[in-house]
Amino acid sequence: MIAQPPISPDESHSMRHRRRIATVSVIPTLLTLGNLICGFAAIHYASKPIGPSNVMGWSTLTIAGALVFLGMLFDGLDGFAARLTRSASEFGAQLDSMADMVTFGVAPAFMVLRLVSYYYGGPEHYTGILGPDADNAYGKIMWGVAAFYICCTALRLARFNVEIASTDEADHRFFRGLPSPGAAGAIASLTLLHQHLMVIQFHEIPPDGFEKTSSLLL
């Protein structure tokens, strides 16, 4: 049996340092996965019938929009955690883009289809009136617009990954064009308008409500 040479103090310190970095680098990965889960949950809630829920009286579509904004928070925190722990890597960049594709690509497009189908076809309709097999041009066009948005998001994220060949996190602080979270935030903001319209629909406003509110503000 060949005896192993003793490990020097410097090598022992280096091994402990690598183990610590490997442990700490899990934090950015978990934050990125949190973004991915938010996107999946947003699609889940958007697929439900639109109406008031048990969550603060919000509609299911409003919850989906809030989850997109929560995904934006996770998307910002994972980059901050990677810079803080100096654990930026190609793996993290690719995983981040995959999570962004779901939360900021597929989820907002599906939310728009649900919102349009609700106001165009009535509360009893889902997305059946929209799609390539719809019996009207409007339904086909709206489905095509949503599909075009998803394609643009995929191309935007792929271009970002290809252009950023370096693993230096400082290079990821600059964008060309509109970042996908910004576009998704603009679409998710429509759910806030939808929530406001639902409040007006289910709670009758008195005739003099506007005058009273204006007087109070003055």
Identify the meaning behind each predicted range.
Residues H17, I21-P28, G57-A64, S89-G92, ...:
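Membrane-interface helix-boundary signature
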Residues V68-D75, F148-R156, T191, L218:
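Alpha-helical transmembrane segments of multi-pass membrane proteins
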Residues M1-G76:
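Topogenic membrane-insertion module of multi-pass membrane proteins
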Residues M1-R16, D168-L218:
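C-terminal membrane-associated helical module and adjoining short loops/tails
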Residues P49-L61, V116-W143, I164-E169, Q195-T213:
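Short helix-coil transition/hinge motifs at the ends and kinks of transmembrane helices
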Residues L30, A66, L84-L157:
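Multi-pass membrane catalytic core of lipid/isoprenoid biosynthesis enzymes
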Residues F40-S47, G105-V116, A186-L193:
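Membrane-interfacial alpha-helical segments at the cytosolic side of multi-pass membrane proteins
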Residues I2, S14-L36, A82-M101, I141, ...:
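Interhelical loop and helix-boundary elements at the membrane-water interface
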